[in-house]
Amino acid sequence: MAPANLGLTPHWVMLLGAVLLLLLSGASAQEPPRVGCSEYTNRSCEECLRNVSCLWCNENKACMDYPVRKILPPASLCKLSSARWGVCWVNFEALIITMSVLGGSVLLGITVCCCYCCRRKKSRKPDKSDERAMREQEERRVRQEERRAEMKSRHDEIRKKYGLFKEQNPYEKF
């Protein structure tokens, strides 16, 4: 059996390139022509804000392009209390206040969680003075056990010497 040629020949490459070119040109031809925001002036806020790049000024019923180079629209363009973007029922002042309160709440929550976790982790781990006190206590306990064992062995020797050793079963004699 002869090995099959799996590579693309120049004929197939040209055909594939032509198909891709047709698909890309067809996709770009289907886009509707972009309508400027100013065409929605003196209409409704809903019509203006269907296009996300538009800003509605409620004061003079004007629809204009959102000034993307600036974060907030300047007062010369429209007052913040009259400016609408995204939805018609929220003005920019309310949006700014709401977003700052939510952002502050999130930051405060994260800070509280971090402080709580750090404090909890710190309280779980004994500090150096606690470790030293525990070590000293353990050393005292070990010395006490050694002294106890030493005293017991001395007492047992004395009992053995004088024949006072405790028997396993005291009723064995009878």
Swiss-Prot record:
Residues 1-29 form the signal peptide. The modification Phosphotyrosine is found at Y171. Residues 115-174 are cytoplasmic. It is found in: Cell membrane; Cytoplasm; Nucleus. One of its GO terms (cellular component) is nucleus. Residues 36-89 form the PSI domain. Residues 125-155 are annotated as: Disordered. GO terms for molecular function: p53 binding. Residues 127-163 form a coiled coil. GO terms for biological process: negative regulation of DNA damage response, signal transduction by p53 class mediator; negative regulation of intrinsic apoptotic signaling pathway by p53 class mediator; positive regulation of protein catabolic process; positive regulation of protein ubiquitination. It comes from the Eukaryota. Glycans are attached at N42, N51. It is a single-pass type I membrane protein. The chain crosses the membrane at residues 94-114. Residues 30-93 are extracellular. Interacts with PTTG1. May facilitate PTTG1 nuclear translocation. This is Pituitary tumor-transforming gene 1 protein-interacting protein. It comes from Mus musculus (Mouse).
